[in-house]
Amino acid sequence: MKPTEIPVGSGIPGVNMKKSPFSEPYQAAPDYNLAVCILASGSRGNATFVSSGSTSILIDAGLSGIEIERRLKSKGLSPKDLDAILVSHEHTDHIQGVGVLSRRFNLPVYINSKTQGAAFPQIGKVHDVKNFACGSTFLINDLAIHPFSISHDAEDPVGFTLNQNGTTIGIATDLGIVTAMVKEHLKRCDLLILEANHDEDMLINGPYPWSVKQRVKSRTGHLSNAASKQLLNEIQHDRLKHVILAHLSETNNTPQKAVDEVGKALNPNNVQLDVAVQHECSALFRIK
């Protein structure tokens, strides 16, 4: 199980990672098991596109509906390609566009009941609601999706693993600590989207009020670069071929600091490291 024709590096100016071109468009009849594109990642909006070729979903929709549609189109995609939206938790940077996309394109929204109660005053009526239970695998066509609990200051936040034909993607952002459950679910992934929110020194010495710094550092806050490095040290395995660092703070982190710190846990000959950013889409990564 390995990524194919994937560029190393995010294309971010000043970030010292090798780059290679990525020009092949999305294929409806794929030669891969899963494809992923992070449309946006950060405190101003999060959305991730995942597709098996026959089934395509959004995990969170934290930008406006118009902006998500624009970013999909920049990759040769459309909301009309989507089969569903998954919601990890109710914070605005994860749900801003959920309601309008669901209504406009008749998309079901998969969400747990506690998150639904907290989110729906903001997102309004949707096309269809599909409640999932945390810890129970469910199917969207050929995608097997497993939501698992994470520690964050929301009603019932979750991470996800997505499996198709033996290939697994893991998504874990917006978590203050790494629990045994998180490790268990992420240790079998071929591609991992992992939070690296802040550099600890930048956070402590930065402009945030002390109360906000404490919240970010808390057990229900966000993972630091160092915490992400420690997690990868503990869960590395032969199948893990690609890590994408996500939800970087634009105030308390830089892509280069995240790469330099987290990269210490990875063998660059075996695992590709990329960074997702706020202002532009990632490449469309394919995994066989």
Short names for language-model regions:
Residues 65-111:
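Active-site metal-binding motif and surrounding structural segment of the metallo-beta-lactamase
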